[in-house]
């Protein structure tokens, strides 16, 4: 398939025009007329993925490698080194970020990974009506995500009746959350204080931990295309001791 044909398919699946104004989803590298036979799916780009990717292939990531304007590709700093190596190997790059959060990933994570039934949606926020204690909810999340520990903020409510969920970094949405507990990642100190003042408990899922399912979610929609689709092993840049 041509890169343009793959892009058009992805645009039908998850329209790029619904991405946030600050986002940079879409074709970031490549020639629209390039013929593609192999596609790699990954949460992010790293040197191992570029090394293992075949020439003339396509990488589809969740997070855009290019966010801010680059004045040059002179040195070996991030992301310049990756971009130069991909150009050398004629590797194309498409990113599906906030558009895919809205259309697929938040829903997939809530239903298929956490095993909840969605009550309603409000853009990036998924709401679940499911009464349980805060401790029971924490245990449920750890089991479903295979986590040993969670960073939490408990407002003291004994019964959690409504849960809000957002993959990735959802801390900026706290003022809009109408729930007893908010599940997301990358919560900041003052965001936790704001949540406590609003009687909202927080469960920090971790950014990587909540979005690592991007590749398996997208792969199911690409299986009928005449492409070899390879799910790469995305790695969390953080470790816990």
From Swiss-Prot:
**Family under the similarity heading:** Belongs to the GTP cyclohydrolase I type 2/NIF3 family.
Q: Which UniProt keywords apply?
A: Metal-binding
Instruction: Please list the residues that bind a divalent metal cation 1.
Output: 62, 101, 211
Query: Matching InterPro entries, A to Z?
Result: DUF34/NIF3, DUF34/NIF3_sf
Q: Name the SUPFAM superfamilies on file.
A: NIF3 (NGG1p interacting factor 3)-like (SSF102705)
Q: Which residues take part in binding a divalent metal cation 2?
A: 63, 207, 211
User: Any keyword Cell cycle?
Assistant: no
Subunit structure, interactors included? Homohexamer.
Give the organism, scientific name: Campylobacter jejuni subsp. jejuni serotype O:2 (strain ATCC 700819 / NCTC 11168)
Q: Name one GO cellular component term.
A: cytoplasm
Name of the protein: GTP cyclohydrolase 1 type 2 homolog
Gene Ontology MF: a single term: metal ion binding
């Amino acid at each position: 398939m041509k890169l343009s044909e793959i892009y058009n398919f992805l645009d039908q699946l998850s329209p790029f025009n619904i991405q946030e104004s600050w986002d940079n989803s879409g074709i970031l590298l490549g020639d629209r007329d390039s013929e593609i036979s192999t596609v790699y799916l990954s949460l992010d780009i790293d040197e191992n993925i570029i090394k293992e990717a075949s020439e003339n292939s396509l990488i589809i990531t969740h997070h855009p490698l290019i966010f801010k304007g680059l004045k040059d590709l002179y040195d070996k700093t991030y992301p310049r080194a990756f971009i130069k190596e991909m150009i050398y190997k004629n590797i194309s790059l498409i990113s599906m970020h906030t558009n895919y959060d809205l259309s697929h990933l938040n829903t997939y994570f809530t239903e298929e990974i956490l095993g909840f039934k969605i009550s309603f949606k409000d853009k990036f926020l998924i709401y679940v009506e499911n009464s349980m204690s805060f401790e029971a909810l924490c245990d449920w999340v750890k089991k479903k995500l295979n986590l040993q520990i969670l960073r939490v903020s408990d407002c003291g409510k004994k019964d959690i009746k409504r849960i809000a969920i957002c993959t990735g970094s959802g801390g900026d949405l706290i003022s809009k959350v109408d729930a007893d507990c908010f599940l997301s990642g990358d919560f900041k100190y003052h965001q936790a204080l704001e949540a406590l003042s609003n009687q909202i408990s927080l469960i920090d899922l971790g950014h990587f931990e909540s979005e690592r399912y991007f590749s398996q979610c997208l792969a199911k929609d690409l299986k009928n295309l005449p492409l070899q689709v390879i799910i790469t092993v995305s790695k969390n840049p953080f470790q816990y001791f």
